[in-house]
Amino acid sequence: MATAMDHPQGKDFTDLATLQLAYDRLLHQAQHQAAFLGTASHELRSPINQIISLHQLILEDLCEDPAEEREFIAQANQTIQTVLKNLDLLITLSKLDIGTLQPQPQPILLAPLLTRVQRLVQMQCVNRHCRFSLGPVEPSLSVQTDTAWLEQVLVMRIEAALAQGSPQISLTVADDAAASDVVIHLGANPGEAPDSAVAALSPEFRYQLATRLLLHVGATLERLGTAASPNSHLGLRLPRPASQELLPRNR
């Protein structure tokens, strides 16, 4: 056992270095969290300001006719629905961060999940004139993750690429039988962001949210794009199940 004679002035410098490292990490996490909260506040404030502006036009009788007034009311209603949806997402993410909501990792078949993601984004892609392609997936290929949250991550990243005006998005799987991981590749050609009538989360913030969610699905993120467009090619590395037996049905 170490004594005061083992360390000058009775200090264990190894322990002090460990404490300093832990302090630096916590400080970095606190700064990152503060920056994230600042960004989240800005993202929510923008659509709220839009709602206030629409109501102000109505209250000051600046509408040309009743039809325009109804249009402004409809826009405000659609925007507030977007705000509530975004608030629900942020609240859920905070519950995951503090542990009051626990992800449920389990062995799942990857092909049905990716097919479901394709169905969820297909209409959005058609409306944005974006070509979406899903590469072939081995029917028996499985990963260890939380089905619902992985699905949410993939949808959010595809929606972020759509919001940036990407004309083509691809989802493929790299399956090396000798590797312990499976990599889902998401490629999106750069495009010109279209104007949106309804205020929504910015593409950059969508990427931030999806990255935070990745921590809870057991995945690691690899940015394979260029320095000018780091999110144009992303790799999501997921572990294989310890056992291939008794795979549950995907939710």
Predicted regions and their residues:
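Glycine-rich/acidic phosphate-handling loop/turn and adjacent ATP-lid/helix
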Residues: 179-208
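Conserved glycine-/histidine-rich ATP-lid loop and adjacent helix of the Bergerat-fold HATPase_c
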Residues: 206-222
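Conserved catalytic submotifs in the C-terminal HATPase_c
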Residues: 106-107, 131-141, 176, 189
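Conserved signal-transmission helix
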Residues: 1-32
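Short alpha-helical segment of the dimerization/phosphotransfer core of two-component systems
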Residues: 78-83
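Short acidic helix/loop segment immediately C-terminal to the autophosphorylated histidine
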Residues: 58-67
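Primarily the dimerization/phosphotransfer
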Residues: 24-57
